């Protein structure tokens, strides 16, 4: 698999897959996870925080609409490097855009979201660039590598994406927490954390600019606008004419409802004071417990879920995975009622919940692949991922207001009731019993 390294020749994928997929994850987690923690620590009310940060999912929902442009204009390498440069610029501007509300305003929990207007604009810009980078990176992966290399490196790319998750949700949050504990200045902590992010991302961008290989197959696709538009429209029409489309849409939109509500309120719950109904953990502790231990458990759950599905197939795995995804949400009911401050107990409960989520999410991913089978497999899978993003965006947008109206205990009980939706849509599915099983030769 080793190949000669040259300026215009093929390079070993080991030179670029780690950085490209690490860079794919960082902006996603900064936009969708760090933003939640930062706004919470800055005293933005949960309702406004959850609404605005959920809307940041929009580019990942809409990306199938402009994905053909990445094929038609310029090479995939050009798109990857350009989007990385754009995101580097956005991270640098974020360093200077973060407002500095007074400690009294932060403590009140009523910091106006209007203070963060420019910050949100930069997050939106980063989100669109990140979604476009996803399209280009996956396209580059498929164009440059042969099928054997694609199979070999699929685990490598997933590993570095998960490492970026630990870095984004764990390491960066711990850095912010340590700076906060040493200086007592929350805005300064997040400003310096964004500076660290900008420097690291700039280095990755420079590396990929020079080390990402040029490849003869990585060229703009030449096709007439009319034929491209026709194929694009045909892909959408055939998707919505698939047998079982209503059950599939219900599943894609409702299967993750408990997790979609829960996700936006986990960090606020862990960070909020006891008077506000939270556990009052420090920022650094949340970065360690949720961003590192939790993400590791999530990854292990996904790996074991893949092994289980390959042995039993999707049909037999579906109900156990649905149960694993939904029922561990009870961990937050327990924590909110007991108000435990035992870090070991909190870590174990979060690890169980995240393991269940990783295990249960496997069924969701496999079903999207199953439903996408056919002539327009790639386009149909992209549409499925858009519905996946929508399934997280809409419930998340209202989660904060729901929590403010009900309090954390009642909110987590509502999340448990929503597990009925997960079970209900799972009942609707009809799946080939052999799909997902590894064929023994």
Enumerate the language-model features and the residues they cover.
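C-terminal transmembrane helical hairpin of 12-TM major facilitator-type secondary transporters
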Residues: 315-364
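C-terminal ends and interior cores of transmembrane alpha-helices
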Residues: 85-112, 323-341
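A late C-terminal transmembrane helix in Major Facilitator Superfamily
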Residues: 371, 375-403
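Intracellular loop-helix junctions on the cytosolic face of multi-pass helical membrane proteins
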Residues: 1-10, 44, 98, 104-120, ...
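Helix-to-loop junctions at the C-terminal end of transmembrane segments
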Residues: 62-75, 300-319, 403-404
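Helix-loop boundary and gating motifs at the non-cytosolic
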Residues: 3-60, 247-251, 255-275
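Loop-to-transmembrane helix entry/capping segments in MFS-fold secondary transporters
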Residues: 46-47, 147-156, 283-284, 374-384
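Intracellular juxtamembrane helix-capping segments at the cytosolic ends
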Residues: 132-145, 359-373
